[in-house]
Amino acid sequence: MSAASQRVGAFGEEAGYHKGLKPRQLQMIGIGGAIGTGLFLGAGGRLAKAGPGLFLVYGVCGVFVFLILRALGELVLHRPSSGSFVSYAREFFGEKAAYAVGWMYFLHWAMTSIVDTTAIATYLQRWTIFTVVPQWILALIALTVVLSMNLISVEWFGELEFWAALIKVLALMAFLVVGTVFLAGRYPVDGHSTGLSLWNNHGGLFPTSWLPLLIVTSGVVFAYSAVELVGTAAGETAEPEKIMPRAINSVVARIAIFYVGSVALLALLLPYTAYKAGESPFVTFFSKIGFHGAGDLMNIVVLTAALSSLNAGLYSTGRVMHSIAMSGSAPRFTARMSKSGVPYGGIVLTAVITLFGVALNAFKPGEAFEIVLNMSALGIIAGWATIVLCQLRLHKLANAGIMQRPRFRMPFSPYSGYLTLLFLLVVLVTMASDKPIGTWTVATLIIVIPALTAGWYLVRKRVMAVARERLGHTGPFPAVANPPVRSRD
């Protein structure tokens, strides 16, 4: 057997996975998996920059995030795969598209891991005992601990994410209850009256004008990143057709309550000027209301969120890198699988990239979070656009009688897909308008695109060789032993 066919194996990219995620774990990942540093830490700086109208941005972005998830849900039920939309890009647009989106998504999660290690170090330094420890050392310790846990098994990942997501959800619910009590009772916070009068006394709903609201959109998009993880995780659960629709449809309530509701409540409890970048707005609130130890307790929660996000990032990149490695687009070692069903090669590669973030914490500790956050947003925009494009392609092929769409579908397709792509383009343009960090981030595409192009020419012969081998073993679809049944009408 050739080297290519050995990599492909009898069942393609899904070989070796243990399908060990339980329904309750996937449900909780769907509910709380995306509640991470983008909300717990990033919302503080965005409130300070854009004002209370920020909750409207969360709402608008949330609508499109839900549409993206419905598109992903349709693709998953069309053909479950741990390679997620990288595998679907290969199916609908070919190897070149899978190569490009796979590496862009890897860039997203590699940068997200840097964001998370930076956030963990930032949270820890809120306590005096850790202020004497350099930020980069704290980031390195966090990476080492989470990497070790992630390499054990998918069951460990699922259990860690279940409890971490539960803690995050309970913490946000506690904030919503306490905040609502203060708001309904008109109790002052830090000497300020609560409610709509707070907005009137501090410049209204848009105190900094509409432009900052547009500019912070890329950061809000990052706050929603990881919602697509439910699609990746569905490839490692036994019955995705039963639990995927429930997990995705629960996103509507989660967006309305946890994202839009919490940001609106924060803006009604304290002036937007009370929040600041680098500090969780939830920690700010609990510290201001005088609850003894409440700020420290909330800091533990947001620390859990950052650790959870880092854990999820390593999980996701391991699976994505395994998928593109099985096609020949990534280094061979990233296709390696442990006996416990963990694609450790891709996970370790992500950890190595994250070490550059540790170095960034050493040289630019004050700017590390915003720099890599913007770079991460580029990857998630590419990933989400791919999901929508694949769904549109499935819709077109179904109309032509070539494929069949599952019952769980993206609503108002194809028009909702076109509108979502337009939204993502607007986000990219507004990111470029955020000088200097956002402008420089988008400018890095001048380097990224030629680098991806050059990389493709380096690996294309190997990719095509693997594709030819795979066609003889699994059909054109590497995720299943037999390609899906197609209509011949």
UniProtKB/Swiss-Prot annotation:
A GO-annotated cellular component: plasma membrane
Gene3D superfamilies: Amino acid/polyamine transporter I (1.20.1740.10)
InterPro entries found in the cross-reference section: AA-permease/SLC12A_dom, Amino_acid_permease_CS
Cellular location(s): Cell membrane
Membrane spanning stretches: 25-45, 49-69, 100-120, 137-157, 162-182, 210-230, 255-275, 289-309, 344-364, 369-389, 413-433, 439-459
Membrane topology: Multi-pass membrane protein
Keyword annotations from UniProtKB, A to Z: Amino-acid transport, Cell membrane, Membrane, Transmembrane, Transmembrane helix, Transport
Keyword Transcription found: no
BP terms from Gene Ontology: amino acid transport; transmembrane transport
Family according to the record: Belongs to the amino acid-polyamine-organocation (APC) superfamily. Amino acid transporter (AAT) (TC 2.A.3.1) family.
Protein name: L-asparagine permease 1
Source organism per UniProt: Mycobacterium tuberculosis (strain ATCC 25618 / H37Rv)
